[in-house]
Amino acid sequence: MTQQSGRIWVMGGRPLNGTAAIPAAKNSVLPLLAAALLCRGPVRLRAVPRLSDVECSLGLLRGAGCAAHWQGADIVVAGMPSNSTLPGETAAQMRASILFCAPLLARLGRAETSLPGGCNIGARPIDLHLEGLARMGAKELDAGAGKLVLAAPGGLHGTDFTLRFPLSLIHISEPTRLGMI
């Protein structure tokens, strides 16, 4: 193996083949759980890590009116969302709760919750998420301190949107991608 100009070259006499089990990661599971709000049929995610943010996500799904439960190491989510208000106490426990707003806007035309919370690793504003949703037709309604209320009475629509820096934020593009589905 050699490394040149930012690339890794693997040299050998045999082609690679076979399978590899890749464990699920929290930052890939959370957007998939939010995307389950967009699905008409049941969703099964396999080999999901049992983490507090995953448990919070299940609480948000249940708060939206979906059935969401563990089956061994899998999660099954069924039903369409019927409630646009997410449990504020649950949403305030994790940063990724913002991911659930776009699917609710797409399905119900409204999303209401508390501001996202989570770990204290520094300032992590949600302005870029809200900017993307606004470009797609969502409007932020005045809800008071600590609350977030979004409405898209005409539905969400596609748009051209360039994310401004910092692009390194976790989940920065997911709300807009989920809103486009």
Model region roles, listed by residue range:
Residues 19-22, 42, 47-48, 119-120, ...:
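Short, recurring structural edge motifs at helix starts
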Residues 170-171, 175-181:
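Single conserved hydrophobic/aromatic residue that forms the stacking wall/gate
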